Every structure is written in structure tokens, then in C-alpha cells.
Amino acid sequence: WKTAQKMTRKPVKFGNICATCLPMMLWNDHYKTDQAMVMDIAAVMNEEYIALADAGCPVIQIEEPVHHFNCQMEPPCTDKDLEFYTNAFNRQTKDVKTEIWAHTCWGNPNQQSFYWERPSYERALPYFMEMNCDVLDIECASNQARDAKLFKNIDWNKYDKKIGIGVVDHTRTTVETPEMVADTIRRALEYIPEDRLVITADCGFGREGLSRRIAFYKCVSLVMGTNIVRKELGVEEAYVATADEQFAFV
């Protein structure tokens, strides 16, 4: 993280996998159960996160707590399993004094999703809300913010976390227009308070080889679409150099 941060004046977010993801990638030749292994891994990760925070890292993003995926398994996970996933996540983040993001999506293998029709977060959401994180982000662009309605009955006085919604799709090369982004945000605002809403992408672009140019313009649309809604809400808009006419070639 320190090496990356030296390369830019902008804050660098540190990304790391969730401990509950690892059993599908590791051979367990030592522990009696995968859950015991996960909790030990979570404890080791926790030490690293505390060191990162102490070094000045402003944001740690933990990738893919597995609740939503394992709800789709056959047979599906139990409520007890979902409670364990939340407890393991909270062990990872215990006493970490920096901003924590939990990223969730429906997959990004080779710029693909694991599902043609995206499932719902409905069963996983109550357990996600109990995770010790400052921002919970979910995939929304791919399904036109269909799951935003799941936040309708959330008691916002009980939770202090923010909700990040993806407004550009990592699995499509077609760049969303700013108007499409704005429409996704408006749908989310029907259920999520504006001071709790964070605008992001469904997933990352770089790891799986999406064209840098396409990724760039998706990010431009993300900001320009957000500006449309900011203007509607009377909130200051962000400057977008790409849209500044003084830099145009024609």
C-alpha cells in the first residue's frame, strides 16, 4: 500500500479477499472444519488490516463475503451458515481504525458474471447489514437497480453504514450514458437516503482485461450521471475534465 500511495496524490484504497471466500481455493489438510480455518485466517488478516490502518491507509475494501453466492447453492446455505459468514467478516475487521468497504457482486471471471440472470440479494441482506463495515456495495447496474427496493424497510437509525450501488456494468463493453447512470441513482434514492448513498461500479475493470478506454469512459459516465442527480438535489457538482469544452479537439 505504501508503494502504491507514493505514486499518486489521491488516496489509495487497499483491496483484499474476504476470509470466507478462501475455502474454495485452499486445501484444508490441518483443520477439522473449514470454519475453523476461516476464523484463523480472519484473525491473521485482522492483524494486517490494523497494521495498514496504522500506516495511514484511508480505506480497506474486503471483497466478496460469500453470503449471497452461497444462498444460490444447492442445497442453499442455512441461517446458521449466514451468521457464521457475518461473524467471520467481523473478526477480520475487529478494532480496525480506518474506513472499511465490503464489496459484493455476482462475479467477474474473465469479465463475466456467474449468472445470466442476476439473482437477488434478498436473503443475504439482513446478514450483510450486521457486518462491521462503513460501506456495503452491491451490484445494481446489471439489473436496473432491482434490488434497491430491498432497503425499503431498513431502520436507518439502527445502522450507520452507507450503501454503495453499482451504476456501470463491468460485464458489458457498451458504455452507459450519463442519463442511464442518473436513472439508476434515482431508483436507488426511492429507498436509500441520499446521505447514505455511495455511487460506484458493479465491480472492478482492470483485473479481467476490460479495455482501458472503455473503463475510462464508464467512469466518466459514472461522474457525469451522478452530476445530473446532484444538480436535481441542489448539491455541488463534481468537475469532469473530460467533459470540459476547453479541452475539445473540435
Q: At which residue positions do the language-model features occur?
A:
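Domain-level signal for soluble alpha/beta catalytic cores
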Residues: 1-250
